């Protein structure tokens, strides 16, 4: 059942996830320059944590709070798409291909690792 407490937990952890995403994006931009390593990092981490939570059979309320709140706001499909469009407008087509391939590869790898770790945790 969806309670006020559960909604508050999603809200709180969503804020924390958004702040974590912002911090990683700023750090990566300062450290690595224009290539969107920050987006790559937060989406990979979100895939890892989300798949772990599902495979570990976390109970519904914590899964909603951590998965829907923290992980949902940490990962950013909209920023990935915006970055691809920005690179396209600048004619950085090779970087688009690299970014998309890296995003898929790291996302799939992180998901597989998260599933394995979650299954081991649940066992």
Q: Predicted regions: what is each one?
A:
Residues 1-123:
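Membrane-interface helix-loop junctions in multi-pass transporters/channels
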């Amino acid at each position: 059942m969806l309670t006020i407490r559960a909604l508050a937990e999603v809200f709180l952890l969503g804020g924390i996830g958004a702040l974590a995403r912002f911090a990683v994006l700023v750090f990566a931009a300062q450290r690595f320059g224009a290539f969107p390593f920050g987006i790559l990092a937060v989406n990979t981490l979100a895939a890892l944590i989300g798949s772990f939570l599902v495979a570990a059979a976390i109970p519904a309320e914590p899964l909603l709070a951590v998965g829907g709140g923290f992980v949902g706001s940490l990962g950013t499909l909209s920023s990935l798409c915006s970055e691809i469009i920005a690179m396209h407008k600048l004619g950085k087509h090779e970087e688009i291909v690299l970014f998309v391939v890296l995003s898929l590869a790291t996302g799939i790898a992180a998901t597989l690792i998260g599933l394995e770790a979650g299954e081991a945790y649940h066992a």
